[in-house]
């Protein structure tokens, strides 16, 4: 098996050798919930920081204040330890404006200058949000001159009426001060490219960064896609058929798929990529190794 991996990674680097122009990469983590998972996260960070990413980001998780504190604490630790810009996700779904102002001021005073502003998931469909992402962006800008990234949805947000509504909403976020949009993960590249072209057509000129999900566990992917409106192509299901208990082969196939996606997106002019790591480094590191010191 070691020989297989050795040959595979040599092939991987061969495939990516023609990517020579500057590329920005970033990696997303979630806050660890115990000592063991935090130890694992630091091992992941130690490896991925060698790739000199543009930034790391840390999810907000659920909307509880305890979870927000976990995000804040780990963001500060990562930035201090690595010296790399670390971006907290901030959701507004279950927080008041005053609470959000306190969080924003605390981040700014701690040296955090970049926030990923999100509404957050609604778990009670009978509860209509009082604050949306565009409101959060305005609130953050009223506190300080944060750099603000937002979410975008090539396959349309699950709650959006249609693609046009999604574009209108993204444009409102840009007008409020967003300077980057990171997309939900996807496997239909044509869908992403149509979304990018639609953004350009509607004078949305910020960087649209594709979210890349390196597959290591197909069952886990299906779980995520079921709540995020991400379509799973039939060919992808066929690729992983019968591999539920073969994670090594799954990782190799997942790497190959992600490599092909990066190659095609690069050929279409994309120069920034955001990796959803799930606090794992192996596949993301292998894919990005050729990009070392490019950002």
From Swiss-Prot:
Q: Which UniProt keywords apply?
A: Amino-acid biosynthesis, FAD, Flavoprotein, Methionine biosynthesis, NAD, Oxidoreductase
Q: Record's superkingdom?
A: Bacteria
| UniProt-listed InterPro entries | FAD-linked_oxidoreductase-like, Mehydrof_redctse-like, MTHF_reductase_bac
- First-level EC class: oxidoreductase
Q: Does the keyword 4Fe-4S apply?
A: no
EC number of the protein: 1.5.1.54
Q: List the disulfide bonds.
A: none
- Reaction equation(s) it catalyzes: (6S)-5-methyl-5,6,7,8-tetrahydrofolate + NAD(+) = (6R)-5,10-methylene-5,6,7,8-tetrahydrofolate + NADH + H(+)
Q: Name one GO biological process term.
A: tetrahydrofolate interconversion
Which residues does UniProt mark as catalytic? 28
Name the cofactor(s): FAD
Coiled-coil annotation reads: none
A Gene Ontology molecular function term for this protein is:
FAD binding
GO CC, sorted alphabetically, is: cytosol
- Which residues take part in binding NADH? 59, 184
Quote the record's binding site residues for (6S)-5-methyl-5,6,7,8-tetrahydrofolate: 121, 184, 220, 280
Positions annotated to bind FAD: 89, 119-121, 133, 153, 157, 160, 166, 169, 172-173
Pathway given for this chain reads: One-carbon metabolism; tetrahydrofolate interconversion; Amino-acid biosynthesis; L-methionine biosynthesis via de novo pathway
| Main function | Catalyzes the NADH-dependent reduction of 5,10-methylenetetrahydrofolate to 5-methyltetrahydrofolate. Is required to provide the methyl group necessary for methionine synthetase to convert homocysteine to methionine; the methyl group is given by 5-methyltetrahydrofolate.
- Similarity annotation: Belongs to the methylenetetrahydrofolate reductase family.
What's the protein here called?
A: 5,10-methylenetetrahydrofolate reductase
From what organism does this protein derive? Buchnera aphidicola subsp. Baizongia pistaciae (strain Bp)
Native organism taxonomy: Bacteria, Pseudomonadati, Pseudomonadota, Gammaproteobacteria, Enterobacterales
